[in-house]
C-alpha cells in the first residue's frame, strides 16, 4: 500500500490551519486572514495547474486576525469561518454564479463569487473550530474561552440564534465535530478530554467525558459507517497517540464510552488532525510531518497500511481530511505551515 502525491498547491504565503472540500470546492483558512476558494474537482484527472483554479479570495478585512477554521454547510455552498478575532463569518456563493445547472458545482469559474451573509459574535476569545450538523440546522463553534456554542441557523444561512452555551471544559477547546448521521457533537480540549454532547428536553447536555489521553486532544472524527448503529470516534493528541472510542450504552442522556483501541504508535510528535473515511480508513497527521493511514483487519485489530514522512517537507501538518473529487474517487488532502495543500492518492 502506498501514498502518492497527486498535486501540491501553493495557496498561501503563511500557515494554512484548516481546509474543507465540497463538490471540488476547496476552502482554506490561513494566518494571513484570507480564505481562498479553489476548484480542485478535476485534480484526480490531472487537469489542475500547480496553483489550482482560484475562484475567489474572500476579503482579508473581514477578520482582524488569523482564520483558524472553515466548514461548508452540508449540501450547500454556504461557508462558515472561525477566527482568532473571536468572530465567525458566514459566506455564500451566488447560486447563479458559475453554476448553470444548479448542482452546486462550478460550470463557469470566471463568474464565481462569494458574498458575506453574516458575522456571528459571542465568544470572548479566539474561535478555534466551526462545524455544521448533519443537516446544516446547527452550527457548533468552540473557543479559547473554554466554551462550545451551538447556534440554530435559518434555511438561507443568514440568521443565527445561540441556543446553548456549553462550559464544562476546564481549558481551551480546540475542535468540534458532529456525527455524520446523528445529532451528536464531540469537542476536544486542552484539558486532555473529549466531551460528547446531545440534545435533551430542548437543551444540550454533556452525555460523556472521554478520558485517556495524556495531553491536549487536538481533534477527533466520527466513524461514517451507515450499516451499523455503533458509534465510534477517533482522536489525536499531544501525547502522540491516536485512540478509538466506542459508545457501549446510550439508554439515557448519560452514555458509557470505552477506549476501544490505541492505534500503532507511529508518530513521534503531537497528532494535530485525524480523519475517518467512508471506507473505514483512518488518517492522522501532525507536528512530525508524517501522514499515516490505518485499517481495521478482520480480527478488529488496527494496522498501519501506509505512511509518508516529510509530507510537507520540514513543516508541520495542521489538518488532514478525506475528500471526494469529480471522478468519484477518495483522496487525502493535507495542509501545513508551508502554505501548501497537498492532494494524495492512496493505492
Swiss-Prot record:
<dbReference type="InterPro" id="IPR001680">
    <property type="entry name" value="WD40_rpt"/>
</dbReference>
<protein>
    <recommendedName>
        <fullName>Probable cytosolic iron-sulfur protein assembly protein 1</fullName>
    </recommendedName>
</protein>
<feature type="repeat" description="WD 6">
    <location>
        <begin position="266"/>
        <end position="304"/>
    </location>
</feature>
<feature type="repeat" description="WD 1">
    <location>
        <begin position="11"/>
        <end position="48"/>
    </location>
</feature>
<keyword id="KW-0853">WD repeat</keyword>
<comment type="similarity">
    <text>Belongs to the WD repeat CIA1 family.</text>
</comment>
<dbReference type="GO" id="GO:0005634">
    <property type="term" value="C:nucleus"/>
</dbReference>
<dbReference type="Pfam" id="PF00400">
    <property type="entry name" value="WD40"/>
</dbReference>
<keyword id="KW-0677">Repeat</keyword>
<comment type="subunit">
    <text>Interacts with NAR1.</text>
</comment>
<dbReference type="GO" id="GO:0097361">
    <property type="term" value="C:cytosolic [4Fe-4S] assembly targeting complex"/>
</dbReference>
<dbReference type="InterPro" id="IPR028608">
    <property type="entry name" value="CIAO1/Cia1"/>
</dbReference>
<keyword id="KW-0963">Cytoplasm</keyword>
<dbReference type="GO" id="GO:0016226">
    <property type="term" value="P:iron-sulfur cluster assembly"/>
</dbReference>
<dbReference type="InterPro" id="IPR036322">
    <property type="entry name" value="WD40_repeat_dom_sf"/>
</dbReference>
<feature type="repeat" description="WD 5">
    <location>
        <begin position="212"/>
        <end position="255"/>
    </location>
</feature>
<feature type="repeat" description="WD 2">
    <location>
        <begin position="62"/>
        <end position="101"/>
    </location>
</feature>
<dbReference type="GO" id="GO:0002098">
    <property type="term" value="P:tRNA wobble uridine modification"/>
</dbReference>
<keyword id="KW-0539">Nucleus</keyword>
<dbReference type="InterPro" id="IPR015943">
    <property type="entry name" value="WD40/YVTN_repeat-like_dom_sf"/>
</dbReference>
<feature type="repeat" description="WD 7">
    <location>
        <begin position="311"/>
        <end position="347"/>
    </location>
</feature>
<feature type="repeat" description="WD 3">
    <location>
        <begin position="122"/>
        <end position="161"/>
    </location>
</feature>
<dbReference type="InterPro" id="IPR020472">
    <property type="entry name" value="G-protein_beta_WD-40_rep"/>
</dbReference>
<feature type="repeat" description="WD 4">
    <location>
        <begin position="168"/>
        <end position="207"/>
    </location>
</feature>
<comment type="function">
    <text>Essential component of the cytosolic iron-sulfur (Fe/S) protein assembly machinery. Required for the maturation of extramitochondrial Fe/S proteins.</text>
</comment>
Amino acid at each position: 500500500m502506498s501514498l502518492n502525491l497527486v498535486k501540491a498547491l501553493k495557496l498561501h504565503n503563511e500557515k494554512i490551519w484548516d481546509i474543507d472540500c465540497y463538490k471540488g470546492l476547496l476552502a482554506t483558512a490561513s494566518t494571513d486572514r484570507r480564505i481562498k476558494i479553489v476548484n480542485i474537482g478535476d485534480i484526480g484527472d490531472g487537469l489542475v495547474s500547480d496553483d489550482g483554479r482560484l475562484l475567489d479570495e474572500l476579503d482579508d478585512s473581514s477578520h482582524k486576525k488569523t482564520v483558524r477554521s472553515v466548514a461548508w454547510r452540508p449540501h450547500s455552498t454556504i461557508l462558515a469561518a472561525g477566527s482568532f478575532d473571536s468572530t465567525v463569518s458566514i459566506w455564500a456563493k451566488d447560486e447563479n454564479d458559475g453554476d448553470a445547472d444548479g448542482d452546486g458545482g462550478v460550470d463557469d469559474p470566471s463568474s464565481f463569487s462569494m458574498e458575506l451573509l453574516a458575522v456571528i459574535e459571542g465568544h470572548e476569545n479566539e474561535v478555534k473550530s466551526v462545524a455544521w450538523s448533519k443537516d446544516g440546522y446547527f452550527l457548533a463553534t468552540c473557543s479559547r474561552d473554554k466554551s462550545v456554542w451551538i447556534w440554530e441557523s435559518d434555511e438561507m444561512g443568514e440568521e443565527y440564534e445561540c441556543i446553548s452555551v456549553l462550559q464544562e471544559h476546564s481549558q481551551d477547546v480546540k475542535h468540534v465535530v458532529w456525527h455524520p448521521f446523528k445529532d451528536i457533537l464531540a469537542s476536544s480540549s486542552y484539558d486532555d478530554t473529549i466531551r460528547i454532547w446531545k440534545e435533551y428536553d430542548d437543551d444540550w447536555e454533556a452525555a460523556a467525558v472521554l478520558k485517556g489521553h495524556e495531553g491536549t486532544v487536538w481533534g477527533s472524527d466520527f466513524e461514517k459507517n451507515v450499516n451499523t448503529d455503533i458509534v465510534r470516534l477517533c482522536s489525536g493528541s499531544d501525547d502522540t497517540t491516536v485512540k478509538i472510542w466506542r459508545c457501549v450504552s446510550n439508554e439515557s442522556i448519560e452514555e458509557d464510552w470505552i477506549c476501544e483501541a490505541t492505534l500503532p504508535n507511529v508518530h513521534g510528535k503531537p497528532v494535530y488532525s485525524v480523519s475517518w473515511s467512508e471506507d473505514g480508513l483512518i488518517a492522522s497527521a501532525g507536528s512530525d510531518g508524517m501522514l499515516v493511514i490505518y485499517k481495521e483487519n478482520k480480527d478488529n485489530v488496527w494496522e498501519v497500511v501506509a505512511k509518508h514522512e516529510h509530507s510537507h517537507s520540514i513543516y508541520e501538518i495542521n489538518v488532514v481530511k478525506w475528500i471526494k473529487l469529480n471522478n468519484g474517487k477518495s483522496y487525502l488532502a493535507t495542509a501545513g505551515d508551508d502554505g501548501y495543500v497537498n492532494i494524495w492518492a492512496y493505492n
